[in-house]
Amino acid sequence: MSYENILVEPEGAVAIVTVNRPKVMNALNAKTLSELAHAFDALEADANVRCIVITGAGDKAFIAGADINELKAMQSAMDAKRLAYFGQQVFARLDRASKPSIAMINGFALGGGCELALACTLRTASKTAKIGLPEVSLGIIPGYGGTQRLARIAGPGVAREWVLTGDLFTAEEAHRVGVVNRLFAPEELREGTLKIVHTILSRGPVAVRLAIEAIRRGINMSQQEGEIIESDMFGLASTTADMREGMAAFLEKRKADFQGR
């Protein structure tokens, strides 16, 4: 399917999703969010796709937040609540997906753009990128899951600083507090990100899926409850042909040929 505001480009087992509104720094309006929701659903259902990379068009912005004109048009608290819930549900598709997603942050990742990145499994960034949640400077707060995901990823102290000041942070600062996983020079961002992707793709597909599930579910549980989930996922992995192939390949000192079953 073709879209108006996003591009979806398959590269083997990888799908690269680009928010394509460079004239407005790839701002997220309702149509763009709807297109992302459709694309995320389609990619989750596509057995040929094993990893999703998300980025923004151009070299200035990843996604510079929500569309201000749409925010201004809100007439009531219920309008705002509906908008926030809609964005939360779009981003939750990434958070709950069985496939890993990587936000490839090539420029400003602000507000809703930062929140979209936080919903991804991993985040890579250009060393020149700026990241933040500046909503309080507009008299509102993050509404697409930012207050919750940032606290879980980087801790409540970092979340309070980012949300309450509304400051923008360098990619280096975001990396230091754990928001960004890997930093690259701008000209090396795509290659470096895809190298991470292909490392993940070389691992056991079932094991990757089960590991994502164990981490996602365990975050909201006690240590003891999380370890029960972990042992469940470990048990499932141990019954797969991939596990037998991985063990055999290790003992035979060869590269494993995983089949995803």
Where are these regions (language model features)?
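Terminal peptide-recognition signature
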Residues: 17, 21, 36, 54, ...
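Terminal low-complexity tails and localization/encapsulation signals of metabolic enzymes
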Residues: 1-3, 248-261
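Hydrophobic alpha-helical membrane-association signature
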Residues: 32-35, 83-86, 189, 230
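Conserved CoA-thioester-binding segment of acyl-CoA-metabolizing enzymes
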Residues: 1-55, 92
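Crotonase-fold acyl-CoA enzyme core
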Residues: 92-208, 235-240, 244-248, 254
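Glycine- (often His-adjacent) and acidic-residue-rich active-site loop
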Residues: 56-93, 109, 221-222
